[in-house]
Amino acid sequence: MNIVARKLHTSYNRSMKVNLLHDWQVTINQAFDIQKRLARQVSRNNEIITTPRFIAGVDISVDKAQGLGTGAVVVVGYPKLSIVETRIVQDKLEFPYIPGLLSFRESPLILAACQKLEVTPDLIMVDGQGIAHPRRVGIASHLGLLLNTPTIGCAKSLLCGSHETPDEKVASYTEIVDRGEVIGAALRTKEGAQPIFVSIGHKVDLKSAIYWVLQCCRGYRLPEPTRFAHLAAGGNIKEISPTAQAARNVVQLNLL
């Protein structure tokens, strides 16, 4: 079956550059092969600058009835975590929903949103998996490679592997292990709430990933960058900031 994913229009390119690591017009089997190749390119070493100035969160929402996706990127200033910029794009989702291949379905929207940024983030937190993925390259790793930027996977659910339940105290965590390999951490970010699943995306180690997620938590289960992006992608822009509406930029993509 020949499933075609979108190509981004090159005019949507201001601050962030996208590495052309592969074609987006691929079959499912080709997507698997691309993931296996990209997994070897993921850096598990920390390359986050000592004090990031800007941290971005990205997420996507889906209107299943219309097959429409809304991708959002919200950039915050560190350490106050106040919103600096919000970009949102909407378009039809061409690639099917296949667990483990969500990056081929969702990444084009996120990339288009990132390409419209005026501010370049030093770190991106992704609502999804990094190397905590069967082929060790979830959407956080995929985006990190494409954007050549440190990324962290901050998932709300576990895709693969197993872990012990972390203690109830905030900052407690247990390792996620799959086939004998540590691929992430089940991290308690809020007392009384389920842990989130943190993993290396690209250009970061697990210890640093956990540290920065905790630095960006402000009493909610999710770190502020991905929490804001989740709200923005769902159309709840006013919930994240009274002035965020002015920063909203909804674009109907022109696709090749």
Language-model region placement:
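Catalytic-site beta-strand/loop segments enriched in glycine and acidic/polar residues
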Residues: I110-S141, L147-T149
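Extreme N-terminal basic, low-complexity initiation segments
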Residues: N2-K7
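Two-metal-ion RNase H-like nuclease active-site motif
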Residues: R53-D63
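A glycine-rich, hydrophobic loop/mini-helix early in the fold
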Residues: A65-T120
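A contiguous pocket-lining binding segment that forms or flanks enzyme active sites
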Residues: H133-I183
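A short acidic-Thr-Gly-centered motif at the start of a beta-strand
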Residues: V42-T51
